[in-house]
From Swiss-Prot:
Database matches in SUPFAM superfamilies: FAD-binding/transporter-associated domain-like, Uridine diphospho-N-Acetylenolpyruvylglucosamine reductase, MurB, C-terminal domain
Cofactor(s) listed in the protein's UniProt record: FAD
Function: Cell wall formation.
Record's keyword terms, sorted: Cell cycle, Cell division, Cell shape, Cell wall biogenesis/degradation, Cytoplasm, FAD, Flavoprotein, NADP, Oxidoreductase, Peptidoglycan synthesis
Family recorded in the similarity comment: Belongs to the MurB family.
Pfam families noted in UniProt: FAD_binding_4 (PF01565), MurB_C (PF02873)
Assigned GO CC terms: cytosol
EC number: 1.3.1.98
Protein name: UDP-N-acetylenolpyruvoylglucosamine reductase
Length: 311
């Protein structure tokens, strides 16, 4: 157990003991963490992350909780929250600096207001800049790494600035999973007033499409599974279509349900547990494997599960 007195020598932010993580999850699911830390700023975050590394104590970093499922039993590691504190944005010409806790949608609008295009393709994609970078978020044929100039991380207790060509990015993953992303600089495209209006209209259309096809009115964490890779020259298949073909839309387990709007979403109907969600995940994986011979891979991250959970 970390000594609070030792922690206070390096950390200026908020400290909560035995705090619920459900409020920090887009699923509104999760048990308690032994200790939850909210840094005051980026320097505070760097200090506390280095502190845990030097003490060889495990820790978990959370952004907006939009791509995670947290165990009902909570976590014994310290949890560091970046949302609400690392939210600085600086726009200089076509270069956009954003800290990890910045909401991706707010950044998209802010960039368009400065007549910079590129982020409108991610309209409606939930989460923070940091989370989007770690998982190489994508939508409508585009990925966030198309726009990256550099990424600032804490790696093995040291602060590093990594250029785009120093990072391995693939479909919905990067080699940054063991690092803590603190900030990034994006290189966007200057656009004319006419193009700006077109981009805002494109953003409106994409948001409307999401409202019509995704269960945005209920707590969820976005796509549960990655879309499987192309097979035998076929185009990429969609996980949601495979799950729907297995007749699983609307199937419930406890307080969780495979969405009747989009089968690659699981929603919290009000009293869902992580165990409920896991049961639906395993059901979908099993049914798709038996019918199509395809192993679905999780897009979300599982936090706090001590027993082996197949990913």
């Amino acid at each position: 157990m970390i000594s609070i007195a030792d922690l206070r020598e390096v950390f200026r932010g908020d400290v909560k003991i035995s705090a619920s993580l459900a409020e920090h999850s887009a699923f509104k699911i999760g048990g308690k963490a032994d200790i939850v830390l909210k840094p005051l700023d980026k320097a505070d975050a760097i200090n506390v992350i280095k502190f845990f590394h030097e003490k060889q104590k495990p820790h978990i970093v959370l952004g907006r909780g939009s791509n995670v499922l947290i165990s009902d039993d909570g976590v014994r590691e310290a949890v560091i929250l970046l949302s609400g504190c690392l939210e600085k944005v600086d726009i200089n010409g076509e270069l956009v600096y954003a800290e990890a806790g910045v909401d991706l949608q707010k950044l998209a609008v802010q960039s368009l207001n400065h007549r910079l295009g590129g982020l409108e393709a991610f309209s409606g994609v939930p989460g923070s800049v940091g989370g989007a970078i770690v998982m190489n978020a994508g939508a409508h044929g585009h990925e966030i790494f198309e726009l990256i100039d550099w990424v600032e991380v804490v790696r093995d207790g040291s602060l590093k600035k990594l250029r785009k060509n120093e990072i391995k990015a693939r479909y919905r993953e990067t080699d940054l999973a063991q690092d803590t992303v603190l900030s990034a600089r994006l290189k966007l495209k200057p656009i004319s007033e006419k193009e700006q209006a077109e981009c805002f209209e494109r953003r409106r259309e994409l948001m409307e499409k999401r409202r019509n096809s995704q269960p945005l009115s209920l707590p969820n964490v976005g796509s549960i599974f990655k879309n499987p890779p192309p097979y035998n020259g076929e185009s990429r298949q969609f996980a949601g279509q495979l799950i729907e073909a297995c007749g699983l839309k609307g199937v419930r387990e406890g307080g969780a349900m495979i969405s009747d709007k989009h089968a690659n979403f699981i929603v919290n109907l009000g009293n869902a547990t992580a165990s409920d969600v896991l049961a639906l995940i395993e059901l979908a994986k099993t049914k798709v494997r038996l019918r199509f011979g395809i192993d679905l891979e999780l897009e979300i991250k599982l936090i706090g599960f001590t027993e082996h959970v197949e990913k």
